[in-house]
Amino acid sequence: MRTPSAKESAAIAAAAAALGLIFAGYSTYDYAQQLDRQVHAVHCSFIPGAPVSTEADNACKTALFSPYSALFRATWWGGVPISLFAFGAFTFFVGFGLYLALGARGSRAYSFYAVAGLAPFGASVVMFFISALHLHVFCKLCVGIYLSSLVLALAAAFGWWASRREAMEPVGTVPAGVPRAPRRAQRWGWVLLWLAALGASAVAPALAYVSGLPDYRSRIDKCGKLAVVGEPHNALLKIPTAHPTRAVLLFEDPLCPTCKVFHERMVDEGLFDRLEVTMAMFPLDAECNWMLDRSLHPGACVVAKAVLCGGNDQARAILEWAFDDQDELGELGKRSGDALASKITARWGPEIGACLGRPQTAARLNQQLHFAANNHIPVSTPQMFLGDKRICDEDTDLGLRYTLAQLAPEVLP
């Protein structure tokens, strides 16, 4: 079977880069859609151009809203999506692959392409392990970029090998237009020029992106304040943290997926342990929350009571356990409160289990709900107050680090 020539390998590499360019383009488009501070559907398919996903929660949305999707988040609202750098780099690799495929090029050009092709592959390996170890999901657009990078690296490396083999073949057996021998006199200046072109291609889209970003500073403190600062019954939780530098009040629902993502983001970015955390349970469950006419998260009242039963010292551990096992606990909550209580007792012991049914626990949860009502808290979670200032819902995800950099820079690690 005939092996591909150097030019054919370069063409394959260019095609792989073009596919990566498309995947990176859709990922960047989805990210840029969020800049109006609203929630939008995202693309999540291996087929370029497929319609956006209408699912409320999918792997691509998880990746997009993760701390790993962008750089310079403290400098610009939302930061600069890493897919922009991939978009620029893939553009270069498409162009350079065509440059090799359409003309007679020396071995040094192929060797540069092979070595440079390791850059997107290396970045893909890093992001693959982040997805596996931290996000626990694989975004299809991201996987498309990973595979494109792999094929690009392999094809570029094979093209280098083929160019060296062809350069050493006897005259008459070499395809037309291929150099007959290594061009040792080729100047290293070309390599520096190509390297500069790669760097410029990778950075240029990001520079264009940030130059077009609006100024969000005037918007981040326009979402109201606490009407009632203190809770008269001392019902709120005080969560111990390692290096508290700024007071924050959080309203959380332990079975709320958005609360889980929000909490994990703050922990992953090193923010949570730099906050002096006061927490109120705000379960979106009509069983105890009289502000609702139907339960959005059945069973959340029972789990919220478990968090309260843990007291200040155990509340965080129980809350994070609830976030980790949220799907299972949510299913148990839909079935019966008793099944959910049994699960909690099995994990946290009979003392916590007995506390769930005590009138004092129900009264404390009700006091926290009254505290929320007195402060006109929207019936959605999470809610975050920095001091007495409410952080806008739009600024608790992509814009969180930027908002804290503006309002509480001492919180940033």
Q: What is the predicted function of each stretch?
A:
Residues 19, 249, 254, 260-342, ...:
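Structural alpha/beta surface segment adjacent to cysteine/selenocysteine redox centers
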Residues 1-5, 165-189:
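Membrane-interfacial, low-structure loops and terminal tails that flank and connect transmembrane helices
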Residues 80-102, 123:
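Hydrophobic alpha-helical transmembrane segments
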Residues 30-41, 122-150:
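Interfacial helix-loop-helix junctions of multi-pass membrane proteins
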Residues 188, 192, 196, 245, ...:
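C-terminal cap of thioredoxin/glutaredoxin-like
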